[in-house]
Amino acid sequence: MVSLTTLKAIKLTPGLVARFLVLPIHKVKNPCIYCPGICLASCPTFVNTGNMVLSPLGYARFPNLAREKCLKCWLCVYECPVEFPLPDTFNKEPVVLEEVSYKPGGIILVADQDIDVELASILSDKLGTGLLVIRGIKNRYIHGGPIDEKSVKKIKKRLAKAELALAVSPETAHTLNINPLILKLPALGVKVSYAGPVHIPCLLRKYKDELLDALEKLGVALTSINEECVKLSMKKDVLYLCPEAKNRGGKVVYDLLLSSMSTH
């Protein structure tokens, strides 16, 4: 684990940002190579190991290593003053999204075939919503790479027919830039019973305040917030919001939701 001394040394200051921003960013393919490490303290693999190679600075220089070791959590992008999408550079071949199946509805749940299709199918039936299942998203968060924009437009065109499109997984919400289902659950009139720590997914960090508000309305009594990446660490006493955590043996909010709905 990286030392606190190192983390304190990597501090974002106005001067540091100013020096970075005067670089001809628009002329370089990867500004991370010229960056002094503004985002390092946000990188889980760097914080966990203290190894500079296993950080955005290393991943920017060694894409083959990045495809294997980077968690594709996008936290570095959120910290970057120019929001450079480093994980998109790890593969040159764009990730193409494909429609697998479609069930119409006023509200459409969107799921990935390889992440959360079984869970989404059950939720769709229980909540009485439509369901769009696509393929391709999971690969983006395993190996990295840009999204094929033409395929995204096709998916968005399909979703435009619905009143509301909601992503079951953080990966889908992030890729398609649509709201995560958890934000709208209170409006659907469902409740859960839980008191304890809650995990905020890396890819949903921008929704943090909204997520906490939605969870409170759902009936969650929050005692603390966990923000460790599920690809590095899982805890038995934490409630997770992402289906990926369920695949890793974690307690997921959707399990509580389905259990609650089955008793009513």
Language-model features and meaning:
Residues 2-15, 21-29, 86-264:
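Iron-sulfur cluster-binding electron-transfer modules in prokaryotic oxidoreductases
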Residues 33-65, 69-95:
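Iron-sulfur cluster-binding cysteine motifs and their immediate structural context
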